[in-house]
Amino acid sequence: MQAAKDPQIAAIAVTELWHGVERATRTHKPRREAYLQMSVESLPILPYTGTTALEHARVWAALESSGKMIGFYDLIVAATALEHGDLVVTFNQRHFVQVPGLKVIEPK
């Protein structure tokens, strides 16, 4: 059995989370900002690199040629996970299970 890796997060996922904070109402924004800042500080952020870009292009082309497509940001998350040999933990399995070779689990 393979040992579990510590959680990591793709830079694009951090962008999506911060976008949610920026769209929050003035009432909710400070609390959400503090929570996200604390959460992000505890996780290594995986950058979008040249290798990620190549993996991104491969996944994009494979899905496109099979007539399937997922969101642009989801493609980047998938490519980042594949590049690092990681799995994706998401409530949105419907999109990610379409990516060949990507391991996907739903959190409990």
What are these regions (language model features)?
Residues 1-83, 98, 103, 108:
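PIN-domain endoribonuclease scaffold, especially VapC-family toxins
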